[in-house]
Regions:
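Interfacial loop-to-transmembrane junctions
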Residues: 191-212
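Hydrophobic alpha-helical segments and helix pairs
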Residues: 45-94
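Alpha-helical transmembrane segments
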Residues: 92-109
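Cytoplasmic-side transmembrane-helix entry/capping segments in multi-pass membrane proteins
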Residues: 1-6, 31-32, 55-67, 202-209
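Structural signature of hydrophobic alpha-helical transmembrane segments
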Residues: 26-39, 170-182
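A generic, lipid-embedded transmembrane alpha helix
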Residues: 4-20, 41, 68-72
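A mid-sequence, solvent-exposed acidic-amphipathic segment
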Residues: 120-162
Length: 225
């Protein structure tokens, strides 16, 4: 499965780079940015196969999302070309921001898996128990992913203030606001999990709320257009 996953990620990379990288610059349409984010997500999830048994359920969703994102990028038309090849600071900011989003998305899938396992355990209708990961392990990996994503989002916000001259401009300020709100939501969630042992619906609600705010912050202007 790992070898097949690597081949799939390579094909995803080739397809996305052909759509994203143009002779006059980089084509940052919503479909292409989404395909790039899903590429980072698929690559990370595939490498995680080597260490985490808990990744099997999320992996199915990740690969399905990757296939759909590539298909949409190939079908969708549009042009939003920018040339950032010589702006190392901006490349770093965009890269770390997309990777943080990918990790938050994977953490969200883990939250769904955690909720499902918790419900099955309570109802005592859990089949194939030997094939499923322990609930505590899934919970620990969920916390680890969210913490790593939060750290990257912090770096993304700081680098955005440094490298984006219009970070607080009127036409861009909504991105800073929604992304900062997402940061606060995730910070509260992490504190609740670490200090007060939150789990179940409360954690899932925080994870969903954070993803919604972050999606609006990252892609809101593209969606409006």
């Amino acid at each position: 499965v790992f070898s097949i996953g690597l081949v799939a990620v390579l094909c995803h990379f080739i397809s996305t780079s052909q759509e994203l990288l143009l002779s006059e610059g980089q084509n940052f349409t919503l479909a292409n940015v989404n395909a790039l984010m899903s590429l980072l997500l698929s690559a990370f999830a595939t490498l995680t196969l080597l260490k985490w048994r808990t990744i099997w359920f999320p992996l199915m969703i990740v690969y399905t999302f990757g296939i759909c994102s590539v298909a949409v990028s190939l079908i969708a038309t549009g042009n939003f070309t920018k040339n950032i090849a010589e702006n190392a600071g901006l490349i770093f900011h965009l890269g770390i921001a997309l990777f943080s989003y990918a990790l938050f998305f994977l953490a969200f899938i883990y939250a769904l898996q955690l909720k499902w396992l918790d419900q099955k355990l309570k109802s005592k209708k859990l089949f194939f128990c030997s094939m499923l990961p322990p609930l505590m392990t899934v919970e620990r990996h969920f916390f680890t992913l969210t913490l790593a994503a939060q750290a990257m989002l912090t770096v993304a916000l700081i680098s955005g203030m440094i490298y984006l001259h219009n970070f607080f401009a009127p036409e861009q300020v909504h991105k800073a606001i929604f992304t900062s709100l997402a940061w606060i939501i995730y910070a509260v969630q992490l504190l609740g999990q670490w200090k007060f042992r939150w789990r179940g619906n409360r954690v899932l609600i925080y994870s969903i709320s954070g993803m919604i705010l972050l999606t609006i912050g990252y892609f809101g202007s593209h969606l409006v257009k």
